[in-house]
């Protein structure tokens, strides 16, 4: 007798071993039709898998997160089925699930085109309409090898070679004549795969190594139903409209080019935006007791060996040589700040000592990981380091937390999640030190009265960190600020202070950043605001435009007055119709356009229009200036 315990605590008895689907059928035809897979004693299995012992069972449907993941994984196999029907000579590689979708890597003698993608998507739809069952067969390893040899699937054979010899049987999933190996589970029938869409094609390399052969990667997305798919497509379209690369080009903010991969060319308007953020953060430094410093871009590798970066981070560093000495271009600012601290003696009465730097760093990110200004090789951080005693950790972290929240809210971010990244496998120091560091962060957040999520294994090699994850206007989450507790690096680099007993001790070092990479933060700001920055932040706050040449001198005077007041303003004196000027500057998302005609010139006034098209009417220049000040500009 087999006893199956369901999530509500009820039990069902079966005389013989029973499949997940058979249990679902015993509950009801509707549930059986909706069944995708099962979780037996917490382990995901196929609907066809047989339970031969007393167990707990949760039926997985498309309403479950796991169900949607299974749908996506099965859609990847469906890509394989369609591709092999259309292009029999290609070689299938691997097709995993990723966030909100899936991809399949394929070796093809020629690159796939958009027309190919459309044909593949069409064939997938035709296969789904056939409403066929997906059949799972556990198959001996030797037989699997013979199956893929007969089909010429060289990459599948390589993947089998990589598997442990302990694996002597594999799940083979049959989509009619097409077969793929997988741990599973997969959907029992193609009717679950109707809400899918192929999204793009890109290049990839076998095993992610650029020295290996290039593959074609087909990306797609799949959901529980058409409604979810349509909502996703709408969200992606909105994200494309907000893409910082697109807006950066439209508004002439920056550009990137092949000769400098991962490095940004800032144009005047983009640099104006940068300066607004930098000066704002500089004020935060000053108000929080940070002394701003500036440290060298390159340092001898001996320092990076002492700091631990050489052993733990050198693959991400750039190096250069001069006069038979090897130098590293700094990937982080912390070792430099310790050198500043080490100049002179410090008493416990001097602590905490806080240094801040808009430090330019370089990291050798893989070219495939680069993405606009969100993922770059050269970047500037609002980097700060606090040298303090153990007893001061909680108060410093608490103060930073309150400060970070205030900054995020000022930039328009109200939904903030807090996480603690805990010790990684590759790390400095012993467990007792890590226990102390992680405990200090938990205590500080408890004192702040906030909830947090913990991320095992995601801390830096020298210490755990608090992470601030911000939700943007379309619901995407971005990781920005960090606060890290470091008991390691001060000792490795000889940082000391004299305690109340006249003994030399190593300070605790707190690594903190609020916006993190300036480049990345600006990219996020562009997308969050869709280029429509609040007046205080906009690279150009006001454009003053004349209707005819008769107002040119007055326009120049208004522009000069606003510039002298510290506003970012430009004039448009071109011989164009005013309607054309209004449209152009509205598309540039300039917050305010001042239109000057004869009436405004005679009355010493300005006619004010907003980028949304609202006509605020005529007002004195002083009244307009007061309006800007009221908006924080």
Curated annotation (Swiss-Prot):
Residues 1-61 form the TGS domain. It is found in: Cytoplasm. The keyword Nucleotide-binding applies. The keyword Cytoplasm applies. Its EC number is 6.1.1.3. GO terms for molecular function: ATP binding; metal ion binding; threonine-tRNA ligase activity; tRNA binding. Binds 1 zinc ion per subunit. Zn(2+) binds at residues 334, 385, 511. Keywords: Aminoacyl-tRNA synthetase, ATP-binding, Cytoplasm, Ligase, Metal-binding, Nucleotide-binding, Protein biosynthesis, RNA-binding, tRNA-binding, Zinc. Residues 243-534 are annotated as: Catalytic. GO terms for cellular component: cytosol. Belongs to the class-II aminoacyl-tRNA synthetase family. This is Threonine--tRNA ligase. The gene is thrS.
